[in-house]
A protein has these predicted regions:
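Flexible, small-/acidic-enriched active-site or ligand-binding loops
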Residues: 5, 50-81
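Hydrophobic/aromatic beta-strand elements that line small-molecule binding cavities or substrate pockets
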Residues: 1-3
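Short beta-strand-to-turn element immediately C-terminal to the catalytic PLP-Schiff-base lysine
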Residues: 5, 32-35, 46-48, 74-76, ...
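A short core secondary-structure module
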Residues: 11, 15-56
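Long, acidic (Asp/Glu-rich), low-complexity accessory segments flanking structured domains
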Residues: 76-95
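Alpha-helical interface subdomain recognition
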Residues: 7-12, 98-245
């Protein structure tokens, strides 16, 4: 939890912690959402990363999406100016919900890319691998699993394309995009499982990339809203009943 309080007519003090902030270690400026006890709103502020009291630490030991330096940030009596408040960032829910439409759409397409990467690795391996005097691609079960991965991937791509078109027209809702993100990442997990099975024991080797895709997909399935939360957002729109507690 992060809070901002008034010191005087020109300054505020910021206290709290944030976790899993992407590439914060590289940032010169931080966009920080903090609760204002005075008006009960969660507001957005622009904070210089070098301001005294700001501590940024890279989260170590990640197995997934390692290209992103996720960080813990602590704010301890950080003084900022009232003018550092982002003018239109007065309500976290309203402000972030709009950006989540775009980011969740991007995650869905990321799941498509990972799935197609899995297919490429699997079909290459199964074409080259010979067992019982035959290439793996000549076996029925191999073809069935490859076809399932491709069918899932094509469905994910077309679904994402449709939602992207609705987004550009301003017609996509939070439920539309939430359901898309949840469904695509769920199918991507299935694709990763099938791809790993096709490579047998070799599927766990780094050189074959399947496990890398699998681990990255686990992050896609969780961030920008978990599967359950996104489906509940969709469920609220479908039924008119808010089951989020």
């Amino acid at each position: 939890k992060t809070f901002v309080e008034e010191i005087n007519s020109e300054e505020l003090v910021l206290n709290g912690k944030k976790r899993w902030v992407g590439n914060a270690s590289l940032a010169g400026l931080l966009i920080v959402w903090a609760k204002n006890p005075k008006n009960k709103n969660i507001e957005g502020y622009l904070v210089d990363a070098k301001t005294p009291g700001v501590t940024v630490n890279i989260i170590q030991g990640k197995l997934s999406l390692r290209m992103v330096q996720n960080c813990d940030i602590e704010f301890k009596n950080v003084k900022i100016k009232k003018s550092d408040k982002l003018t239109k960032a007065n309500n976290f829910q309203e402000s972030v919900s709009r950006s989540l439409l775009f980011s969740r759409l991007g995650v869905s397409l990321g799941a498509v890319g990972a799935s197609l990467g899995i297919y490429d690795e699997a079909v290459k391996y199964c074409t080259e691998r010979v067992q019982f005097g035959k290439r793996l691609t000549s076996f029925q079960l191999t073809q069935t699993k490859l076809a399932k991965i491709m069918a899932n991937s094509q469905a994910m791509l077309l679904y994402s394309k449709r939602m992207g078109e609705m987004y550009l027209k301003g017609k996509a809702t939070g439920g539309n995009i939430g359901m898309l993100k949840a469904w695509c990442t769920e199918k991507a997990r299935e694709n990763a499982m099938l791809g790993r099975e096709l490579l047998g024991g070799n599927g766990i080797l780094i050189e074959n990339n399947i496990m890398k895709h699998m681990l990255d997909i686990e992050t896609l399935h969780t961030y920008e809203g978990t599967y359950d939360i996104n489906m509940l957002v969709a469920g609220k729109e479908l039924t008119g009943i808010n089951a989020l507690r």
